[in-house]
């Protein structure tokens, strides 16, 4: 019943990014190349996130490759304790990325869902005892970056479009997997400010929104209590828009105040489609 309650009433057209191996080349001269983890749940629930990620990176001179076989990082299976399924997903993803890495000149492996990014950064620990995978897992974990980390190293100010009347204010929700799992808290807010938004934080920013892993399904009462507490704090912050870096949080909190991925707001500020 809890799982059914979480299903959206409608779904967008499934994301074409990742249906096959693709490379999105920048129109500007650049020297960087990254692999993007397109994700599984995110591709079904909000394809706009990958589209915004690719647009922004391309404008910054970054070539983006997505591998068809790397369809899932294994986090969802790992969250429910299905170690076998998680390991198979990890293996498929690692072997696919190994082919790409062996071509050379890959600067980063980019995740734009922080739950996935935390998982990928932990691959070296997760399969470090596997002789087949240990080497490539260490290589991948060393290259794994949240999208905010990649953009922070690039000349973002150079692609921002003018906004004489300002861009408005955003409340930033810090996903647990980003602020606790990856120790990234201030950076996304800095990027939002850099492109012209006023950024607010809710009180108790360290608290979970109730959507970590699958306990919003397995422990719905606890998860709903956390959700309501987070929404009340967001409402008190007073901004008309909310940014977050994880699809689970976005789905959990989206409602009267629209919640979008941080990269969608950055894309909007750089000439992309409106985020809300």
Can you say where each PLM-predicted feature lies in the sequence?
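Iron-sulfur cluster-binding electron-transfer modules in prokaryotic oxidoreductases
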Residues: 1-276
């Amino acid at each position: 019943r809890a799982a059914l309650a979480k299903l959206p009433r409608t779904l967008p057209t499934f994301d074409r990014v990742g249906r096959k191996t693709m490379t999105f080349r920048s129109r500007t001269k650049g020297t960087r190349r990254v692999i993007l983890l397109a994700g599984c749940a995110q591709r079904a629930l909000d394809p706009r996130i990958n589209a915004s990620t690719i647009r922004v990176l391309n404008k910054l001179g970054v070539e983006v490759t997505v591998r068809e076989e790397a369809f899932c990082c294994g986090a969802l299976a790992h969250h429910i304790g299905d170690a076998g399924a998680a390991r198979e997903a990890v293996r498929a993803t690692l072997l696919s990325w190994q082919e790409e890495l062996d071509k050379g000149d890959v600067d980063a492996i980019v995740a734009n869902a922080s739950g996935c990014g935390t998982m990928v950064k932990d691959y070296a620990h997760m399969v470090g005892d596997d002789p087949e995978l240990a080497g490539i897992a260490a290589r991948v974990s060393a290259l794994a970056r949240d999208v905010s980390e990649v953009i922070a190293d690039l000349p973002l100010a150079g692609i921002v479009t003018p906004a004489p009347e300002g861009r408005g204010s955003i409340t930033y929700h810090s996903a647990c997997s980003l602020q606790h799992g990856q120790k990234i808290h201030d950076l996304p807010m800095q990027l939002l400010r850099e492109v012209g938004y006023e950024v607010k934080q809710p009180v108790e920013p360290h608290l979970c929104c109730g959507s970590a892993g699958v306990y919003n399904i397995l422990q719905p009462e606890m998860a709903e209590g956390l959700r309501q507490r987070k929404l009340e704090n967001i409402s008190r912050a007073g901004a008309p828009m909310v940014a977050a870096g994880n699809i689970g949080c976005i789905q959990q909190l989206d409602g009267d105040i629209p919640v979008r991925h941080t990269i969608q707001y950055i894309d909007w500020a750089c000439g992309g489609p409106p985020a809300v």
